Amino acid sequence: MCGIVGVMSTDGFGPVGAYLIDSLEALQHRGKDSVGVAVYNAGYVERDAIKLHVLTKDVVGALSKVSTAIASVHGDIRNITMGLYLKEGYSYDSIEIVYKGSIKHLYDAVESTGVAKVVSIGRRALIYKYTTTVREFNGIFNISGFQGSHGIGHVRFSTESGVDIFHAHPFQDLENPDITVVHNGQITNYWKLRSLLEMKGVEFLTDNDSELIVHYVAYKMSKGLSLEAALKDAINVLEGPFAFIIATPDEIGVACDRLGLRPLVIGISDTIHVAASEERALQVLESKYNAKFRKKQLNSGEVVVWRLKR
């Protein structure tokens, strides 16, 4: 059992980080193994700007090796924030770069150093995740201070794959790193679909079945499908009990399995659109932000997509 949430500010910019943290705290009872968020359009100013989060070994010269690796693929480092969090011999570092090349090449360059592992890469998505509680997570990264257009979040109770930062949600697609997903449930035909995607050149970074969803949807969108069409395709192919929320730079999509075995509640107000595993997350936002939601539970096999107004 995990808790998932997606929020969108109807005017295109607002306290999305605070919305996510407040919602996730209301869902904390659904999982305490890890927590993560993706906040969109949080204010990158340079063209081709990327925010890279890495776990760097806390040893002399490690960050220098990472910097050299980034330069080797023509990445231009603009800022490094070291030691956002220190744990078990690793430093959680944030690196802002300007980069026009392949995200996969950048990922491989950093991983090849042997002293760092990539946690996330984003252009318009700012992704943070860690193995901790919502309250401690917010204390480390100050997520509640982030402004943005929309975002998704997750609290995890692990049932199958490992418990570490790399198995924490949100998951992203390396070819399309600003497509991210949070998921509650199980994908029972995971290995079959994974094999099919790998034959098409899709690379998986974990054995978490949730990662399959983002790759599947991103692949379908790369072939010309809209987010809504890709989600409808996905729920007809994915098997098992599931509900998920997926985000792109301009949209949030929500979907649940054909039997409706994992609940999702959506709420529409003049200021916020929200989807969450439980109504209590919506109630917190109503109370704290004076939102008046029109609520409904997602029907079996239903897909809903919200798009930013530009």
Language-model segments: what does each one mean?
Residues 1-310:
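Conserved short alpha-helical segments that host acidic/polar catalytic motifs at enzyme active sites
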